[in-house]
């Protein structure tokens, strides 16, 4: 019943783009508080020759690594995911996720840690990577809160966010004026915390992410350098 209700809500909550998408690439330092050294992360969005977009994220540290890639297209201002792949190794159990979004058959087909996944598909449903682009665009549009329907494991979950305000983030690229956003979770269900900062003057590029897991372990990425639409990101200097 709950899944059917969430699916029906997609008809009323289609993520739409505030502006034309801009390709970007960014490098980050990555810190896991439980490990003594920093790692690195790369995030990029590029448009392919056939018009589809590819969003890629890679992070590595010592023996741990994560790769995440989504492909999607834009149709009348709406994001339509096509494929999603995630591969995580180290730091406990590995994880592999594959999802294919079949818009002709209106279904999502894939696997999550070896278990088959099959879900109904309609416009408005996003994967765990593409929703980040929708959030980035909604923040650019000035929204103070936003919700997305996301394929999460073998279910469709609602991801809620709210804007906390503006904040200056000190990065290796300089001081960046950013909009601070947090993931809203039911504290009776999860004490996990996620906060994101998006650059106001650089296409609302993600400049910082801080996450606290349910076991108290912390993870953070912080911008080192990047480009938006081919222009190097340059913050203010002290």
Where are the model-predicted features located?
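Acidic, serine/threonine-rich low-complexity disordered tracts
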Residues: 19-103, 140-238
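Positively charged n-region of N-terminal signal peptides that target proteins for export
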Residues: 1-4
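N-terminal signal peptide c-region/cleavage motif recognized by signal peptidases
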Residues: 13-15
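Sec-dependent N-terminal signal peptides
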Residues: 6-9
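Hydrophobic, well-structured mid-protein blocks that either form specific transmembrane helices
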Residues: 94-140
């Amino acid at each position: 019943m709950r899944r059917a209700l969430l699916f029906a809500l997609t008809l009323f909550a289609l993520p739409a783009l505030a502006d034309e998408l801009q390709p970007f690439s960014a490098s980050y330092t990555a810190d896991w508080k439980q490990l003594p050294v920093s790692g690195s992360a790369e995030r990029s969005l590029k448009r392919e020759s056939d018009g589809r977009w590819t969003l890629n994220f890679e992070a590595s540290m010592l023996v741990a690594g994560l790769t995440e890639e989504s492909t999607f297209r834009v149709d009348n201002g709406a994001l339509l995911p096509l494929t999603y792949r995630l591969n995580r190794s180290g730091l406990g159990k590995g994880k592999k996720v594959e999802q294919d979004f079949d818009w002709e058959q209106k279904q999502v087909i894939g696997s999550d840690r070896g278990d088959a996944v099959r879900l109904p598909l309609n416009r408005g449903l996003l994967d765990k990577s593409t929703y980040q682009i929708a959030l980035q665009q909604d923040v650019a549009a000035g929204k103070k809160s936003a919700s997305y329907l996301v394929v999460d494991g073998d279910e469709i979950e609602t991801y809620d966010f709210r804007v906390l305000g503006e904040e200056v983030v000190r990065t290796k690229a300089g001081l960046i004026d950013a909009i601070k956003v947090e993931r809203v979770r039911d504290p009776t269900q999860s004490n996990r915390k996620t906060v994101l900062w998006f650059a106001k003057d650089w296409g609302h590029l993600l400049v910082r992410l801080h996450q606290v897991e349910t076991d108290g372990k912390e993870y953070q990425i912080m911008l080192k350098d990047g480009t938006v639409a081919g222009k190097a990101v340059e913050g203010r200097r002290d």
